[in-house]
């Protein structure tokens, strides 16, 4: 009788660990953050607290399943080489704006993206970074194409 109880307890403990691990993965926990500075053409400095997505698995998930992204925060996608980046909004319920940034930190494009839209939003040239923020944040902060992200 004691042996069956121990086996049952071990089974339920293992099941609980599995369920917790599975549910934590879907929640898409926050990544490490860094305060980024954007120098505008007018001479202002604009700051954004950005999560850093620098691995394939973190870049793939991005802001998926996140219902609210506060103003002044974002996610910087870091790639190893320059390429024409394409993003979509699969499983992303929050409207976002994206800036495509070259290897020197110069913002080349800014686009708005609609929640759950599966259309590609492509950079117009080769870039190395993409910065996603709540939709309209770049405009509200006075950030424009040609401004420069101070790279780390």
Residue ranges and their predicted role:
Residues 2-12:
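Bacterial N-terminal signal peptides that target proteins for export
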Residues 19-23:
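C-terminal motif of bacterial Sec signal peptides marking the signal peptidase cleavage site
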Residues 25-152:
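Compact, glycine-rich, soluble single-domain proteins
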């Amino acid at each position: 009788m004691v042996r069956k109880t121990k086996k049952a307890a071990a089974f339920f403990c293992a099941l609980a660990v599995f369920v917790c691990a599975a549910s934590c993965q879907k929640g898409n926990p926050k990544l490490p953050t860094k305060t980024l500075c954007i120098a505008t053409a007018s001479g202002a400095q604009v700051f954004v607290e950005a999560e850093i997505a620098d691995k394939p698995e973190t870049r793939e998930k991005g802001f998926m399943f996140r219902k609210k992204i506060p103003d002044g925060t974002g996610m910087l996608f870091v790639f190893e080489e320059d390429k024409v980046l394409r993003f979509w909004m699969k499983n992303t319920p929050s409207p976002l704006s994206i800036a495509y940034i070259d290897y020197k930190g110069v913002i080349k494009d800014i686009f708005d993206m609609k929640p759950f839209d599966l259309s590609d939003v492509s950079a117009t040239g080769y870039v190395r970074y993409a910065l996603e923020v709540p939709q309209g944040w770049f405009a509200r902060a006075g950030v424009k194409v040609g401004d420069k992200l101070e790279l780390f």
